[in-house]
Amino acid sequence: MIARIILTLVLLALLGPADAQQFGPAQFAIKDDDGDPMSNHSLSADQMAQVAGLPGLVDVGGPKGDVTLYQFYDLNCPFCKEAAADVDALIRGDRTLRLVFVPYPVLSAQSIEAARVELALRELSTPQKFLEFHRKIYGGRGLIDGNRALAVAQMLGFDRKKIIETANTKRVTDTMTTHAKIGSALKLVATPAYVVQGAAILGHPGLEPLRTLVASVRKCKAVVC
């Protein structure tokens, strides 16, 4: 498999212990599908530009959509797995939404291994093929590490050697480091985290609240009208 994990401890140290969904003070009146307030805070125009300029982004919705929603996720976050089905339904039902995946491996060394494979696939395939991988790997159970991610990629027809070579490049390491640094700077201390229209939402609110957020951005250019 992947012979070595470069900067694993550095990546984890950048964020410290990360939680797989965490709640705290809310700046905007955003609620989850149970009616409970979601932890969130505002982001400046400069911070939004930092997110938009990240390397290694994967557009899986409409690339020219009228609303852009970023999802920062860790493949081993249980709430991210739960969110995957909702996010899939969201883009299937909204062809003008630009959904952007941001691999954000902050929970473990195994998450970093798997993210290396993901970022290699991003370079070697299309966004739709990446989405197919995303669906497939979340369809299984148990810990997702580099070996499991590689096995799923091979099932989808990717060349093992090319994946490993790409996954271990400095380019991929730099991408993960940048994601970790920006995520930490933006206080994305829970996974999944969503960034949209000047707001960061920590945790997964559910499908209908996400639809409401997107509708609000379309209507009044804000997450809450």
Please report, for each region that a protein language model flagged, where it lies by residue.
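Soluble non-cytosolic domains of exported or imported proteins
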Residues: V67, P78-K81, S108-I112, L124-Q128, ...
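C-terminal cap of thioredoxin/glutaredoxin-like
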Residues: I2, D19-I30, A151-C225
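Bacterial N-terminal signal peptides
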Residues: I5-G16
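Extracytoplasmic thiol/disulfide redox context detector
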Residues: P17-Q110, D174-A185, A190, K219-C225
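Active-site-proximal beta-strand/loop segments in catalytic clefts of secreted hydrolases
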Residues: F72-D74, V102-P105, I137-Y138, Q197, ...
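Extracytoplasmic/secreted envelope proteins and their assembly/folding machinery
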Residues: A84-D88, A114-E118, F130-H134, G146, ...
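A short, structure-level motif marking secondary-structure boundaries and short turns
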Residues: S44-A45, F72-Y73, F133-R135, I164-T166
